[in-house]
Regions:
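GST superfamily/GST-like fold recognition
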Residues: 144-167
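GST-like domain detector, emphasizing the conserved glutathione-binding G-site
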Residues: 1-144
Length: 167
């Protein structure tokens, strides 16, 4: 059985939870205290972060890698496009999400930044600006790629879910 080591408040962990639930997989979630991680987390992931997926070998970490593995191993419903060119485009969007949105999410989630209101407001502003640029896509389509739920929706959903929390 797959085991997902996951933080209850970690948006990257929530991405993996979405994919596992969307696929209807039988899996176990082991919640990890993000501020007091057990030693075995660093053994499984040299960066000491969650999510981590354990299912035989290899042990996987980093949400986009875990999610692509699950999508390829269990292809229904398909979350990545079948066409290689479209798949490459989705991967570029995922990279853009990381660099243009989730960099700022990391600031908002950081304990160290909690006392730096200027850094928090800058992160909020950057997220707000980028989401405003993306707004036409949300108005036009049911999901980011159109009619079908995809890996792009999985990647963005944890951020959208937390907007009120982030302020």
């Amino acid at each position: 059985m797959m085991v997902l080591y996951s933080g209850t408040t970690c948006p990257f962990s929530h991405r993996c939870r979405f994919v596992l639930f969307e696929k209807g997989m039988d899996f176990e979630i082991r919640d990890v205290d993000l501020y007091n991680k057990p030693e075995d987390i660093s053994v499984m992931n040299p960066y000491g972060q969650v999510p981590i997926l354990v299912e035989r070998e290899p042990i996987l970490y980093e949400s986009n890698i875990i999610n692509e593995y699950i999508d390829e191993r269990f292809p229904h419903p398909q979350l990545m496009p079948g066409d290689p060119v479209d798949r490459a485009r989705v991967r570029l969007f995922l990279l853009n999400f990381e660099k243009e949105l989730f960099t700022h999410v990391s600031t908002l989630e950081s304990r160290a930044a909690k006392s730096n209101e200027k850094a928090l407001e800058k992160a909020r502003s950057n997220i707000r600006d980028r989401l405003t640029q993306m707004a036409p896509v949300f108005l036009k389509n049911k999901y980011i790629l159109g009619e079908n739920f995809s890996m792009l929706d999985v990647a963005l959903a944890p951020l959208l879910w937390r907007l009120d929390y982030y302020g």
